[in-house]
Amino acid sequence: MRMSAKAEYAVRAMVQLATAASGTVVKTDDLAAAQGIPPQFLVDILTNLRTDRLVRSHRGREGGYELARPGTEISIADVLRCIDGPLASVRDIGLGDLPYSGPTTALTDVWRALRASMRSVLEETTLADVAGGALPEHVAQLADDYRAQESTRHGASRHGD
């Protein structure tokens, strides 16, 4: 999965907003500074998030943004779909419409499994989970497994493998 910078910034901004006390409005410049996001780029991102009703904006001198719902009710998938569209696609073609035949026919099921796996992680992980550092158990286990594989892989490559 390749995530655009815009989507990654959006997730970071939303997690940052999830750390604000309920009813607290965060100014765009403060949000940009907290996450190192270019302010003008963040304005565009927040506009998309507002259009999809993931954030609420407040005008005026004391204005800013807040989550439209509690962080426990907004998944990482919600944010990514708002910014980048579907979670996984192959050349922007529906999986049922891929022109696979013969020995490549089963690839459609590989892409389905990939999409289901990503969807499971991204839909079940909320902004509050990330902000609180307490990921769902299966997500934390997948992350631990990945770190172990990386450690093994990098250790093996250092020893000439």
Curated annotation (Swiss-Prot):
GO cellular component: cytosol
Entry superkingdom: Bacteria
HTH rrf2-type domain segment(s): 2-132
PROSITE patterns linked to this entry: HTH_RRF2_1, HTH_RRF2_2
The entry's keywords: DNA-binding
GO terms of biological process kind: regulation of DNA-templated transcription
Pfam families referenced in this protein's UniProt entry, alphabetically: Rrf2
Misc. comment: Was identified as a high-confidence drug target.
Name the UniProt record assigns to this protein: Putative HTH-type transcriptional regulator Rv1287
Organism: Mycobacterium tuberculosis (strain ATCC 25618 / H37Rv)
Lineage: Bacteria, Bacillati, Actinomycetota, Actinomycetes, Mycobacteriales
